[in-house]
């Protein structure tokens, strides 16, 4: 394993193909400009790797200029390592910076081993800094600290160090400027600074790392107990002068929050951007030079000056799963201590395959990384290939979070089946928690790896009592325009219809159980996963239930449900009806 590189941290004071954006060089000042020219620093931007050690099963769609798009097979740690190495080559001054969600919501080959191999892969890639994302907290902050520091202390159901008996932790640094402990300190350092060169050619790059303020609503509360997640812009603005005072010539923000360009927007330009990050950036100190973002799983390279002329920084994001990287070149004037120019482009990490697209570069597999991934793949194979049942056909995961699918209904049916003994009448599953399709093998065979990919979080099931009026209020929360709009997948016998054209709070048109309208005064036993039970995804009504009973883990429920029949028929859709515009 590579040795830990020297990192300089600042103390907290007072507590696609070749889509490019380029910032024009600053005007030269003959009295102050170094005749040797600017110092070049290369940065590779990553985000939302999610433990995808192996190439994604499905190709990614790469939007092009003119409204066209191409499907490209991309990703895989061995190919990403090769791409990172290629884009760091040719210069002594380089950094690799990630904007969070390196771990969590991961495929079996990483998640089965508590994402230790995802950390190991990033070590081998030469990652320097990672701004923590919400998924870094999926197993709790203590387990996240273990991933940083190493060791084999157990913080959950699974035993650490199953493959690497001396797991040493991350060679790179986690950054969390807006995550504060009860003691008033940040959970991880908020900033770091990296210096290059010497004498008159010395330059320094300061980095601020942080996650989205809404993280507590996206993870199990026990995992972030005792932590406060502060305002993102305030955290950035408090640290910009610190970095400037420490001699930073360029300031980079890595933040796990993102923009939402219009669907089909090419990777270059801002387009009609939306998303929570925009409002944050409109409040950020203009002295920031570069923002590496994530969370929305979108790809873009945006000159934010086209949105707000007072803020001339570039904002980037490289999709998800290691399928892209952002190549960034900073030209720093060491005499004026400023960024003279900045160029950035997103690169598709096309892997070696039978149907490689000649329009995109192909990256060969890095041999050392391939061997490392193979070690974990072999260790996971016995568990992942174990048959757990059969289904009648392919079951795809939801596209939009409001889409009803047979897979979502299958999961809800399995959860209802597993909790009947607790009196369950209804099961509700959040579509955002369904992470992959289930594509059966020969004869309809489904493996443990298949169901794990679809539900990778290991949530337990909880059954509680709710009044009919609470249940209706819960259904309304799905459609609250102030939050993330998604509909539940629901179990057999339960149905509801909604109309987004109606006023907020009255968008549920009807709801019924076994054909009978929900009675606001009656009591109903409802099953949900432990994430929802704690108010996850903003569903606070779930917390108001009574007479709670804890059930099995969601994967065990699915396995038991599939085992009850030789072949389980996929349930029909039609339980959730969108009446908007009808």
Where are these regions (language model features)?
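Non-catalytic terminal accessory segments
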Residues: 2, 7, 20-38, 44, ...
